[in-house]
């Protein structure tokens, strides 16, 4: 496919997507879909991707909007009020719950340590195509410092998970089951960030084993966070189910991490 054909295809599916949200969902969902597309293309891809080491940090905002778009879609008949700037802001930000914004912030804070773990051992490939990633520009020490900061922020954010639900009382059992599950899942992921050793021997495929593990765990971590949010929304039994699933995945990963494994290229 030529560059022009790819551009045309991207424009067409973007327009179709926005129109679909406008006709089948509501104006607010269409607005955030439009915002996501324009921010990703103009701010991230055209401006930041090849000019700043903070490219994925700022650009990560576009990738963090799907929960907001989905929540607005599920909310039903939402419309944008343009009578004043205040009315406009209220109409696009007030989705009836803090949870979509909690999930947006979760993805936003997760993005840097997720991608930088990969970039720690793929920085030469990023450099070869002119993408300035943090490890290649600022070095491993600076990258690991910032990754650890984001990991700590994610643990702090986990403490707010029950409050983001909106209908959980801190005296209820579900509040503590869900809250502690979120905290433990975040500590588990944060630990994989803190134990990354850029000086350890690389595998035959060029991986830094601890960085590779953190990268792969980060994907399981994000999925688990969404799973426990969904299960907890179903009540105490759902929160317990989410806790059991999280514990199973964590124990499985810790068990596998202690076993010798064959090197598979990434």
Give names to the regions the model predicted.
Residues 190-227, 231, 261-266:
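Interfacial loop-to-transmembrane junctions
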Residues 1, 116-144, 199-202, 264-266:
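Cytosolic, membrane-interface loops and tails of multi-pass inner-membrane proteins
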Residues 38-45, 104-123, 155, 183-198, ...:
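Transmembrane alpha-helical segments that form the membrane-embedded catalytic/substrate-channel core
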Residues 1, 8, 12, 35, ...:
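Hydrophobic residues within alpha-helical transmembrane segments
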Residues 179-186, 219, 237-251:
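Small-residue-rich transmembrane alpha-helices that serve as helix-helix interface/gating elements
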Residues 1-30, 140-167:
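Multi-pass membrane catalytic core of lipid/isoprenoid biosynthesis enzymes
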Residues 3-78:
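Intramembrane alpha-helical segments
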Residues 16-31, 66-107, 159-177, 230-238:
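Helix-coil boundary and interhelical linker segments in multi-pass alpha-helical membrane proteins
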């Amino acid at each position: 496919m030529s560059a022009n054909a790819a551009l045309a295809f991207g424009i067409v599916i973007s327009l179709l997507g926005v129109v679909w949200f406008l006709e089948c969902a509501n104006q607010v969902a269409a607005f955030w879909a439009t915002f996501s597309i324009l921010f990703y293309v103009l701010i991230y891809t055209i401006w930041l991707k090849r000019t700043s080491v903070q490219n994925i940090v700022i650009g990560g905002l576009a990738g963090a909007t799907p929960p907001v778009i989905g929540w607005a879609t599920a909310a039903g008949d939402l419309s944008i009020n343009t009578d004043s700037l205040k009315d406009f802001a209220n109409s696009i930000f007030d989705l009836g719950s803090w949870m979509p914004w909690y999930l947006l912030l979760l993805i936003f804070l997760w993005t840097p340590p997720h991608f930088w773990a990969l970039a720690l051992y793929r920085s030469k490939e990023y450099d070869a195509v002119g993408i300035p990633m943090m490890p290649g520009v600022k070095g491993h020490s600076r990258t690991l410092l910032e990754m650890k900061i984001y990991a700590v922020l994610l643990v702090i954010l986990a403490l707010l998970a029950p409050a983001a639900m909106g209908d959980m009382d801190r005296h209820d059992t579900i509040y503590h089951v869900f809250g502690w599950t979120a905290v433990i899942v975040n500590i588990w992921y944060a630990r994989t960030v803190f134990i990354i050793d850029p000086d350890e021997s690389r595998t035959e495929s060029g991986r830094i084993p601890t960085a590779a593990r953190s990268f792969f765990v980060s994907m399981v971590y994000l999925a688990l966070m969404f799973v426990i949010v969904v299960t907890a929304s179903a009540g105490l039994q759902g929160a317990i189910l989410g806790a059991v699933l999280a514990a199973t995945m964590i124990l499985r990963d810790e068990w596998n991490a202690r076993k010798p494994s064959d090197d598979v290229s990434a």
